[in-house]
Amino acid sequence: SFPTRRSSDLDFHFGTKASGNVKFLKDNQKKYGYNLIVVEKEQYHNKDISSTSIRKKITEGKMQDVNEMLGHPYRIIGKVEQGKHLGRTIGLPTANIIPDETKLLPPNGVYRTVVVVEGQTFNAISNVGVNPTVETGTKIKVETHIIDYENYIYNEIVQVQFYDFIRPERTFDSLEKLKQQIEADIETCRRI
């Protein structure tokens, strides 16, 4: 059945070659038995918010802008997979999440994040990328260290919310240097 209420903005188009528009919807309210509500587009820094503008900000890693435009934190949801446990061996265990291949991710790098586990939120730091210090593959994953958290969460479904870009992903000469950088990144996150 056709919806009894329809909302759209003035630039809304639909149908073959986007030939349908707000005028068509207004003109056909009685015929199809619905009420049209035309809403103004939301703006961010004096520009219309659109899915295109949001995707552009995501690909630029500008997560604060993304979150303001969305009205909520940008997030990925996934199951925590078993990894090589290298994070645990250096005292910085991580939750490894393989994101859905269709999910748009921010650029490879380290981000201040918040993780939601079983309804509870925790401050975290996440690396988006291929982990070049310890991996040789090209599969993108999200590897998250939950700050001051010790529980095992393998096979749990978690939500990772992105807030701030910290630095680009890079290769380190040793696990010790990687550990030192992660610890510095955690301190950066605590200060933000």
Predicted regions and their residues:
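An acidic, carboxylate-rich microenvironment
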Residues: 24, 53, 65, 174-177, ...
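Short histidine/acidic/glycine/proline-rich micro-motifs that form metal-
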Residues: 11-16, 43-45
